[in-house]
Amino acid sequence: MDRFRPLAVLIAAALTLSGTTALSSAARAADADLARNGGFEAGLDGWTCTAGTTVNSPVRSGSSALKATPAGSDNARCAQTVTVQPNSQYTLSGHVQGSYVYLGASGTGTTDVSTWTQSAPDWRQLTTTFRTGPSTTRVTLYTHGWYGTGAYHADDISLVGPGGGTEQPPAPPTGLRTGSVTATSVALSWSPVTGATGYAVYRDGVKVATASGTSATVTGLTPDTAYAFQVAAVNGAGESAKSATVTATTAPGTGGGSADLPPHALVGYLHASFANGSGYTRLADVPDSWDVIDLAFGEPTSVTSGDIRFDRCPATECPNVESDAEFKAAIKAKQAAGKKVLISIGGQNGQVQLTTTAARDTFVSSVSKIIDEYGLDGLDIDFEGHSLSLNADDTDFKNPKTPVIVNLIQALKTLKAKYGDDFVLTMAPETFFVQLGYQYYGTGKWGGQDPRAGAYLPVIHALRDDLTLLHVQDYNSGPIMGLDNQYHSMGGADFHIAMTDMLLTGFPVAGDAANVFPPLRADQVAIGMPATTNAGNGHVAPAEAVKTLDCLTRKTNCGSYATHGTWPALRALMTWSINWDRFGGWEFQRTFDGYFG
């Protein structure tokens, strides 16, 4: 890739002002510095930066300069788009300090250019030139560092050449007002702005939506929560200043999306088809503390068949297994006590790939048969391993194209429609398929990444209005980058806090600020933890579980990770598994009961 190769030659173009090829005096007069706030004297105005700020020292001139710090997969890119003339020559220059600092231009319509320095302990000027294409009217200027290196500085960035016209950013919108407000959404409208080609909507200072007209509905909100909204007008010259702020408080939750669960619920998996070394636990013997019981597992007859079967544990493996009649009676007794009993599909060994519409339809019919036979309350999706992955051209989580993703979404929507509003739908993805999407999504822009990275995001997003609970498995995980751009590892409260904060705050997918996965409601989110050290890697002591809950629901007892909010409505704790918790003396259950009462 070009970013691995510095330019062999820095082109210094000289304009010859003679003969028929000479620029006219009018064109020469039009040459100007088109970079907005290239000296960073107005902070980051005009620039979009992933990890940048302005500082007063060191500076090359004036009183401010850019400081940007790469971290993880973020190279600390700062960019702005300027209006240019077609078929015109431009000179881009800037002064930088640091190691592996780049300056470049993209969208030129000819050959995009960049230049760099390996080491600049003092201010060093970088310069490059380009010619725009026959229809180019906008070019993006950028500077960035390199992954894993230290902070870099930039100052006095300029783009000299013919101006692209007199277009200026539009005026800020006026008349911003709220309309219909539900438990999870707020409708907004505003007055039109002359010269605007679109609008950007901000929630609590973060861009969350764009609109071509003068209205938008912001979704994915938490019930009974106050939000602040602003809107900016957009045209070819950029964004306006933001409008005046309006506030709205979402309506209280109605309980329809939470399937009548208690305000705080305990979720556990019951080994119903195997013992797994922890011993078999009869459903009737599960204590009343457990609000949602996931029967593990329904598995496919083959990976791509879509034909799901639920076979109860054989007596040879589980000598104390109850009869089918006793099992069904126990389900009814749990339901009469207000508990939810679900069939969980997948697990470590039950890979499910709905590669065809026929497999999709078979999935729906076979899962329905299990639900109907046992009178269950709903379905848990625990697809692991290679069940979900993204095709190379599938880059937008809001509009997936990969058959295994699309067919799963359609199947779950069909089941939800069949069984109605009381149908309980939960999911238990691994961090690799969800939070890793903050850094990587599918195979990536240049290919070569694991296609499973972030692959659950389109499923969660498409079903967010139907989803009762998402309990990501915060265990058996490698280090995952949080919203602080630091890697977090299992074994303490910080990992659970950082992973859950990502779900409740939302995050740019693969670092793309224009492609944000919206937050889930707090009442939809549970934290997945292993019940004992035998159950999985990443077990934490009860004190660490309490720290996690304190920080997320009360913003107390927090560690090094700074959350982006406080969520007293956080719904649940989930564990693998009820059997292992019994094996460990019910420690997980006692921690939950002791905290929530």
Curated annotation (Swiss-Prot):
Q: What does the free-text pH dependence field read? A: Optimum pH is 7.3.
Give the activity regulation note.
Inhibited by the pseudosugar allosamidin A.
**Family to which the UniProt record says this protein belongs:** Belongs to the glycosyl hydrolase 18 family. Chitinase class II subfamily.
**Keyword Signal set for record:** yes
Q: After translation, how is this protein modified?
A: The N-terminus is blocked.
GO biological process entries: chitin catabolic process; polysaccharide catabolic process
**Source species, domain of life:** Bacteria
Top EC class of this enzyme: hydrolase
Please give the name of this protein. Exochitinase 1
List the thermal properties of the activity. Answer: Optimum temperature is 55 degrees Celsius.
Q: Where would I find the GH18 domain in this sequence?
A: 264-597
InterPro entries referenced in this protein's UniProt entry, alphabetically:
CenC_carb-bd, Chitinase_II/V-like_cat, FN3_dom, FN3_sf, Galactose-bd-like_sf, Glyco_hydro18_cat, Glyco_hydro_18_chit_AS, Glycoside_hydrolase_SF
Q: According to its UniProt record, which reaction does this protein catalyse?
A: Random endo-hydrolysis of N-acetyl-beta-D-glucosaminide (1->4)-beta-linkages in chitin and chitodextrins
Is Signal one of the keywords?
yes
Annotated GO MF terms? chitin binding; endochitinase activity
Enumerate the UniProt keywords alphabetically: Carbohydrate metabolism, Chitin degradation, Chitin-binding, Glycosidase, Hydrolase, Polysaccharide degradation, Signal
Q: Which residues form the signal peptide?
A: 1-29
Where are its TM segments located? none
UniProt xrefs under Pfam families: CBM_4_9 (PF02018), fn3 (PF00041), Glyco_hydro_18 (PF00704)
Q: How is this protein induced?
A: By chitin.
Cite the CDD domains for this sequence. FN3 (cd00063), GH18_chitinase_D-like (cd02871)
What is this protein's function per UniProt?
A: Exochitinase that generates exclusively chitobiose from chitotetraose, chitohexaose, and colloidal high-molecular mass chitin.
